[in-house]
Structures are given as C-alpha cells and as structure tokens.
Amino acid sequence: MIGFGEEDYPSLLAECGDPPLALYFNASSPPAAVLEMRPCIAVVGTRDLSPYGRDWCRRLVLAMGEASVPPCIVSGLAFGADGIAHRTALECGLTTVGVMATGIEKVYPWQHTELAGEMVRTPGCAVVTDYPTGSAPVALNFIRRNRIIAGLSRATVVIESKTKGGSLITAKYACDYNRDVYALPGRADDVRSAGCNSLIRQRMADIVTDPEDLVERLGLGKTARRRKAGLETLLGRKYGADSPLIRLALVVKGRPGISLDEIVRETGWSWPEVQERAAILETDGYLETDLLRRCTIPAKIV
C-alpha cells in the first residue's frame, strides 16, 4: 500500500484535487519504476466495442509501441477497449497498468484474471486499486476508479463511448485535471460513438484521425515508420531517391553501433564502397563513427 504524501505515491495523481488517500499496488516492479519512468497514457472505451473500435484501439496502441518515447498504457481491466488496450500493450512490449474497482485480490471481470496475472508478472506493469481487500465491484466504485485512470495519465484517449458511458466520465475527470483528451470519431447514428462525437463537438477532446499523428500530439516523438520515412525523405532530397547512401543509412539506423565490416556483410558491397559511402555520410553530418568504426545515426537526425 502507498499512502498519499509518501515518496512512491504517483506524482501526477498527487496533483489532482481529489487524490485517493492510499493505493494498493500489485506488481513485480517498484511503484516508481511503473508509474514514473514512462509517460502514462489512458486508453479507454466502451465494453461493447464495434469492429471499427477494436481495430482502432489496436492500431493506436501499436503505434504508441513504435514511438520514440514508449508510454505506459493505463486502463481499467474491463471488457472491450480496456482489455484490448492492455493485451496490445503487452504484445508490442509496452508496459501497462490496470486500475480496478475492487480489492486488490479480486479481479473483475473474473475472465481477466489471467490477463491481470500476466501484468503483475511483467516488469514495469501493475494492477492498482484504492479499495481495501474484500471490496466488491459495486457501481459507485467504477466512477471513483475512473478518476484514478485519468489522474495517473498525462492524456486520455477515448475509443468509443455512449453518452452516459464510464469512459465519458474518465474523459471529464481528465478535463477537470487539465489533462489532454483525444476521442475517436464515429458515425452520427452509432450510439457507441455518441459520447466521443459529443466530446469532439464540445471541444472537450481533440479528434483522432491518424495513429502516427496521435503519437506526435501526445509528445511521444515519431513512430518508427515515420522516423524511417523521414530519414529516407531527407537523404533522398540530398542524394537522390535511388542513392545507395540511403540504404547504408537505413542499415545503420536499424542496427545502431554496427561496424563497417558488418555493413559489408549485410549489404554485399565491397569494403572500399562501404568506406567511401560512410565517409560521405559522415562528412555531411548524417553518420557518426567511433574509434572502433562503429556507426550510428546522429540523434538530431532520427
């Protein structure tokens, strides 16, 4: 258990006007390693996700998994968007935190017991609650649980929500805490998107239309796909789209610290060709080498 005011109490949650007095914490890593090492992003939505919602939930979390600054995905361990967000985070190597509306020993719904167990065993992941042992999953608990999801996170992303859905409550808490809110738009006649459309219409949430754009707006840098495209575009303008210098740079970007000998083996080029091309990139500031001739792309480029 972590008490309010203690060193391990989550800093973002402590900033809220109504922080819980204590958090029960179940994880294989210490609290600070879970909640302070990475930016926390809440991903929430209805339990009754449409195929459109399921697809976008996965796409958004997978894009965050490719970000320059990988986040920790926070959600509520419920059916629908929550479960997909947690599982996708684990699948792509992100950490994830499940906030429960029960005592720490009781996973609700019980069908997510195995998922919660995997989260507890995975370094950097956790299951948390502010309810003491023995607390049952009553309706009021879920409203209070939602404020913790919003409070732990620098931003909240709503996948699908009805106008009276719990995800809408989470989004409103996030607004109250001066945190960013993003919402996936849906059809005007789809009740599962009515809440998201309302958030966007009232300007309580920014619209989500592109996973990679969302990653950048969340302050997580660029995705691997955009970083690669950015490097190719930059070098293409400099040397021409078909230049072998682009391939060399992409090889180095994919394997930071690769030696010139390894580049020879990977590309099939001769040693003089590799040496000459590396020298051009280094002279132009697109490549760095150390005393052992190990190559990296400068951080300012990628």
Could you describe each region identified by the protein language model?
Residues I2-V302:
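Glycine-biased, small-residue-rich flexible motifs in mid-sequence functional cores and linkers
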